[in-house]
Amino acid sequence: MKSIKRAAAFILAAFTALTFTACKGKTTVNDDGTKTVQTEKGVKITETAAKAVQTEKYETADFSITIPKGWVVTTGGANIYHTIRVSDPNEPLNCMFILLKAECLLHSYAGKEAWQSNYSMGNTQAALFANAPVLENPSTENFFKIFTQYGDFITQMDTTYSGYTFPRYDNFTVTERFASNSNLKSYALGEELLRATFTDNGKQGEGLFAASVVDFGKYAISSGKLVGYQLQTVDGGYYMAYNVVAITAVKDTFIEWESVLTECMKTLDYSDSFVNATNQASNEKVALAKQISQNFNQTMDAFMSSWESRNKSQDIMSQKQSDATLGYERVYDTETGEIYKATNGFTDVYDGKRYAPVTDDNMYTQAISGYIEKQ
């Protein structure tokens, strides 16, 4: 009889332990790769995509870079015009973008009209300039404001971009500016590092942006107009943009993705064969191809320091507004310090002690680790 009681007690204890374990640690892997963990009875936490991300090395004959696992890498252009886009197939706004050089950003609309007139009269060599976008006030900001136009233009005019899709930065709006430390600063016009918002296919994104706009010089071209029997000319010259870099994410999630994207971008390394081929094909006066890695490393260092010194009140306000719009409140784990978004009312029904409401505004400047719910 005693042995039966002991066996029953053992079975009951084992069942209790299994039940306890199931309630406090059950993990489910979701279709998107994130994990949902049950931390307490009735409490579930689903990690963010940024928290769940794993990385892997991507390598070609031209370059190598560490990327978030599962992201898609596309390339276009040749030599100094080479571009790389690394994007999340589930959310293309989550993206890393590099373009070594953008060319033919016309000085004025008068110059564009002159090139168009020249082209219409049969000068097929004028086609590139006749279709080029205009950058009237040269600066990093204004370059990105016309970047969508540039992407459409160069894709149409340069077959080396065939099959490549440039990101779109429509409605580009600067929210914060930082001083540039690039080695092109003495040549560049209106150069800054920018934090900005934008839209792509109607969806709002946010990110950090850099580019060095350099003047190639004026070029007198006939406007086709006669004044006193003298043919008039206009400025048909253009600007170029070097070291065009952007890291972006869906607005209000960039705070979660920034460190992931920056750390990945820091690993970009162009091969010696690519640099040598670019050197041979280029005749650059202010941005020698051999400086590619140096220029890029400077940009990434500047991104990191700029993000650390950003105006965090902007994040606090934006994150609070996003929570109010989407119906969230924030709580934090008193044991780990991790921060979570919870649907409104979570703290009304949660009677435990581990998760407490966020009362420190500085917590809104930190990335959340996931979403918490009480069942």
Regions found by a protein language model. Give the residues of each.
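Bacterial N-terminal signal peptides that target proteins for export
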Residues: 1-11
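C-terminal motif of bacterial Sec signal peptides marking the signal peptidase cleavage site
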Residues: 19-22
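Bacterial signal peptide processing site
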Residues: 24-26
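Conserved polar/disulfide-associated segments of primarily extracytoplasmic proteins
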Residues: 30-32, 74-244, 249, 297-301, ...
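N-terminal low-complexity, Pro/Thr/Ser-rich intrinsically disordered segments
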Residues: 30-57
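Proline-anchored loop/turn motifs at beta-strand termini and strand-loop-strand connectors
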Residues: 60-78, 265-272
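Surface-exposed amphipathic alpha-helical segments
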Residues: 71, 243-287, 371-372
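Pro/Ala/Gly-rich low-complexity, hydrophilic intrinsically disordered segments
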Residues: 267-325
